[in-house]
């Protein structure tokens, strides 16, 4: 056996008891592991996640307690309170067994995040006339992370116990 393949996938769609609020998300994660001889293997993978949902900040207060309204009431604007994120990541892991309990492992990951969120929500407590002030914000950002880790481990027995020694970068 010199290769193994795997595909993880998920999807979810959910409504809320609040009027106008919902959530949809899905993800895929194909991976493959290739044997490069008897002592070395490389695993390559990709992850994609998409998440879209209504941002719900809950109920405003009135006289120090939650405002008395039906549980399905959305305070703010559900149509303008959305959050979206997309995550794409590539990774590679190289494992090599030297023998006698000595192992080298290098992990690399590059991930890009694209996020947007916006919310129209109660910006004040409900006043005695039954009114409140709405507030709003939005934010968008993109970020790319690069990660690399190298570990050298050695398993030894000493003092009646098995130990793992670790050196890494």
Question: Model-derived features: where do they sit?
Answer:
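Face-selective signature of the C-terminal outer-membrane beta-barrel domain
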Residues: 86, 90-113, 136-169
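Extracytoplasmic loops and strand-loop junctions of Gram-negative outer membrane beta-barrel proteins
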Residues: 12-15, 69-79, 129-138
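Extended alpha-helical regions
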Residues: 29-31, 71-125
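Transmembrane beta-barrel wall of Gram-negative outer-membrane proteins
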Residues: 1-54, 82-93
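Outer-membrane beta-barrel and related beta-rich outer-membrane complex signature
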Residues: 19-21, 41-76, 110, 114-124, ...
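Residue-level preference for alpha-helix termini and adjacent loops
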Residues: 2, 16, 20-22, 101, ...
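Short linear motifs at secondary-structure transitions and domain/linker junctions
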Residues: 6-8, 66-70, 79-81, 126-128, ...
């Amino acid at each position: 056996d010199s290769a193994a393949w795997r595909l993880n996938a998920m999807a979810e769609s959910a409504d809320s008891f609040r009027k106008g609020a919902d959530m949809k998300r899905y993800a895929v994660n194909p991976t493959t592991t290739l044997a490069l001889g008897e002592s070395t293997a490389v695993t390559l993978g990709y992850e994609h996640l998409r998440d879209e949902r209504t941002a719900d900040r809950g109920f405003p207060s009135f006289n120090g307690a939650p405002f008395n309204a039906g549980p399905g009431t959305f305070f703010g604007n559900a149509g303008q309170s959305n959050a979206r994120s997309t995550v794409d990541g590539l990774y590679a892991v190289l494992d090599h067994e030297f023998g006698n309990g000595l192992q080298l492992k290098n992990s690399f990951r590059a991930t890009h995040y694209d996020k947007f969120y916006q919310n129209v929500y109660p910006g004040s407590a409900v006043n005695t006339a039954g009114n409140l002030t709405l507030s709003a914000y939005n934010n968008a950002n993109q970020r790319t992370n690069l990660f690399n880790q190298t570990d050298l481990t050695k398993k030894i027995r000493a003092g009646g116990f098995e130990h793992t020694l670790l050196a890494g970068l």
